[in-house]
């Protein structure tokens, strides 16, 4: 999965091969289906941007959700944005707040800013429920074989 992710990156960034968004997405999907969270994120970005020809926000949300569940803060932030806008998922300020809070807990500065904005839009009860949901969030176990070793070491706090 790691090699597939890296090959997808090469096709996306025109590194050693001719840039080809469709081939990049193909390799990202293979790696993502094996549990590579960065490939999941990049595949979601490809769906969201229309890099493969047509935007598919529901698929973007699905892949952002999977990577977010594996603890990737960039995907947590992007998933929160989708919930806030109702883009590819039903609009839910509670879910947006939850995912911003989870990403903010990992140090994501943009998520911290969005939390401040959403705090003014949610009532105290809703905000407390979203905070409780975020506080209880356990990232799913990360497959060591599907992710880059430094990624696993960082997740484990090593």
Residues covered by each model-derived region:
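Extracytoplasmic cell-surface/polysaccharide-interacting catalytic and binding patches
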Residues: 26, 62, 142
């Amino acid at each position: 999965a790691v090699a597939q992710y890296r090959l997808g990156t090469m096709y996306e960034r025109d590194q050693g091969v001719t840039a080809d968004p469709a081939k990049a997405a193909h390799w990202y999907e293979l790696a993502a289906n094996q549990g590579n969270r960065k490939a999941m994120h990049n595949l979601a970005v490809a769906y969201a941007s229309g890099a493969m020809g047509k935007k598919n926000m529901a698929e973007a949300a699905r892949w952002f959700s999977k990577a977010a569940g594996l603890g990737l803060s960039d995907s947590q932030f992007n998933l929160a944005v989708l919930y806030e806008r109702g883009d590819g998922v039903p609009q839910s300020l509670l879910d947006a707040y939850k995912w911003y809070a989870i990403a903010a807990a990992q140090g994501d500065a943009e998520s911290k800013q969005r939390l401040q904005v959403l705090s003014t839009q949610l009532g105290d009860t809703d905000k407390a429920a979203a905070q409780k949901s975020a506080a209880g969030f356990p990232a799913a176990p990360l497959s060591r074989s599907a992710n880059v070793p430094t990624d696993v070491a960082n997740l484990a706090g090593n």
